[in-house]
Structures are given as C-alpha cells and as structure tokens.
Amino acid sequence: MPELPEVEIVKQGLNQLTLNKRILGGEVLLERTLAYPISVADFLRGLEGKAIAQWHRQGKYLLAQLYKWGKKNSKLQEYENEDGWLGVHLRMTGQLLWVNPEESLHKHTRVRLFFGHNSSGDKDSSNYELRFVDQRTFGKMWGVPPGKEISKVITGLQQLGLEPFSPEFSPKYLNKKLYKRHRPIKTALLDQTTIAGLGNIYADEALFLSGIRPTTICKDLTEKQIEQLHLAILKVLQTAINAGGTTFSNFLNVKGVNGNYGGVAWVYSRAGQPCRICNTPLEKIKLAGRSTHFCPQCQK
C-alpha cells in the first residue's frame, strides 16, 4: 500500500501537472470505486466545468480543492469548500496517472477524468487525461459537494492522528500516544490514529534507525527511545520522499515512474541479507498479520 512518502510524491506531481485546467468530463469504468456520491452521474456532474486549485494530502488521502473554471482561484482559502472537492485513497494498488488521451487504456483503469482548455465536455477534445488505475479495486474516490464539510463525507479523515511533519508532532505527543499501551510498538505505529500516513515499510525502517525491536511493548519504552523514534520517523519519511518513494510492486508516480527508496532500505524486504550496520542476517516475523523486518543485533 502506498504510504505517506508515495502519496506525497503523487500529490507533488499532481500539483505540477493538473492545476488550473478545465475538467471537461469523465468516465467511470468501475462504479464501486465511487465512495460518494455512488451515482456516476452525480459524481461527474460535481466535477464538470471545474478546475483544480490545489492538491492536499492528509495521511494517505489525496484531496483536490476545486473551483469553477474561469473564476480566479487566488482568493481561495485553504480547505474552504465553495465549489467542491475531489478525494482519492489509493489503498493497496491504486495509481493516478497523467497521460495523453490517445494512450492505450490499461485493463485495470477504473476512472478517467478529461482535462483541457476548451469549453467542450467531449472526451475526444481533451488535451490531458488523469486515470485512476487500480488492480485490486480497493481504491476509492469521493466527490464532496460545495458547502459540505469534507470530513463528513470522507469520514476516515476524522480518525487520523497528527501529520509527522506538522509542528505539533513532537516526542511529547508520541509519548502521550504510546504511554501505558500494552501492545507492540510496531502495531501502534501502524495505527492511523497515532500517526497519519505511516505504514509497514517506514515503521520497520524507523524502528531500525531508532534501535528499537518491533516487538517491544509501548509501555516499556524509555523517554530517550521515544525521542530517537520521533527523529527516526521524520528522517526516514523525508529520505523516502527525496528518493521518490518505494516501489516493491505497484507504486508509480503520476508520470508512471518507479520510486527508488527500496534500493537503500535498511531492513524492509531484506530478510536474510546482512544488516548494513553490523552484517548480522536480518530477520522477518509476522506481527499483527504484517511482515516485520529487523536486525536482531542492532535492535534491542
């Protein structure tokens, strides 16, 4: 599943390519991709004649702020909802690809949005196309009507913990979230109510960098360990963003390019290989149903 760095990379690409272009229309090839509204006609009606002012990311959610084509977007306030929003969650295998409309259609294409600078709503007159490709079909899209509170429509936003790069995310916050918890630290880090956007790959990586074994019970962590973990989370996420994210199976950026973090990963997907620090063979276990990688020597 794409995690915070991958979704951030997609957001950055979308902000470079899709802003201020008229949405001419669209085509929904798999109706269950739509979480809200479930009517294809209502979903497309909410997008046609709009343009995207800005893409935002909250955890693993992508949120596009819309405005009516022809209206200046310079006065839009962040997260105001005058003309609607488009929400996307890639889930396990979702991809958002910016392509030439003449490019052949991938068999797992679920939604197509047609962009251009003209007034026609015909897909044949579009200059650009945004495709939502999703092999496993778990990905979702939302059309948030004007005036509606975004989190009332995309209800998963209500449960998210802090963004790791927000000023409020601190060792004190992390300690408060983990204090007295009787579950393994790896499991706690995967909980989106603890940290928004952190997932399996970067939880393993951050625990390695902080020297904490994934099975360590939260309540047993010292303040020093929590401080180290806080720094490690920020470091590994920024490193992954700089590398364009991680591609082990399905992740591509909006131009269809793989991420490069996998080649420099400390422990994730490297079971049996030597630790990059001490050369001890790395181990892999199942923890709360998730593959978990660690160094038995460096992580105590």
From Swiss-Prot:
KW DNA repair (keyword) present: yes
Pfam family, one: zf-FPG_IleRS
EC numbers, comma separated: 3.2.2.23, 4.2.99.18
Any one GO MF annotation of this record: class I DNA-(apurinic or apyrimidinic site) endonuclease activity
Swiss-Prot/TrEMBL keywords: DNA damage, DNA repair, DNA-binding, Glycosidase, Hydrolase, Lyase, Metal-binding, Multifunctional enzyme, Zinc, Zinc-finger
Cofactor note: Binds 1 zinc ion per subunit.
InterPro entries: DNA_glyclase/AP_lyase_DNA-bd (IPR015886), DNA_glyclase_Znf_dom_DNA_BS (IPR015887), Formamido-pyr_DNA_Glyclase (IPR020629), FPG_cat (IPR012319), MutM-like_N-ter (IPR035937), Ribosomal_uS13-like_H2TH (IPR010979), Znf_DNA_glyclase/AP_lyase (IPR000214), Znf_FPG/IleRS (IPR010663)
Catalytic activity: Hydrolysis of DNA containing ring-opened 7-methylguanine residues, releasing 2,6-diamino-4-hydroxy-5-(N-methyl)formamidopyrimidine; 2'-deoxyribonucleotide-(2'-deoxyribose 5'-phosphate)-2'-deoxyribonucleotide-DNA = a 3'-end 2'-deoxyribonucleotide-(2,3-dehydro-2,3-deoxyribose 5'-phosphate)-DNA + a 5'-end 5'-phospho-2'-deoxyribonucleoside-DNA + H(+)
ZnF (FPG-type) residues: 266-300
Catalytic site: P2 (schiff-base intermediate with dna), E3 (proton donor), K60 (proton donor), R290 (proton donor)
Binding positions for DNA per the UniProt entry: H108, R136, R181
Function: Involved in base excision repair of DNA damaged by oxidation or by mutagenic agents. Acts as a DNA glycosylase that recognizes and removes damaged bases. Has a preference for oxidized purines, such as 7,8-dihydro-8-oxoguanine (8-oxoG). Has AP (apurinic/apyrimidinic) lyase activity and introduces nicks in the DNA strand. Cleaves the DNA backbone by beta-delta elimination to generate a single-strand break at the site of the removed base with both 3'- and 5'-phosphates.
Assigned protein family: Belongs to the FPG family.
Name the UniProt record assigns to this protein: Formamidopyrimidine-DNA glycosylase
Organism in which the protein naturally occurs: Trichodesmium erythraeum (strain IMS101)
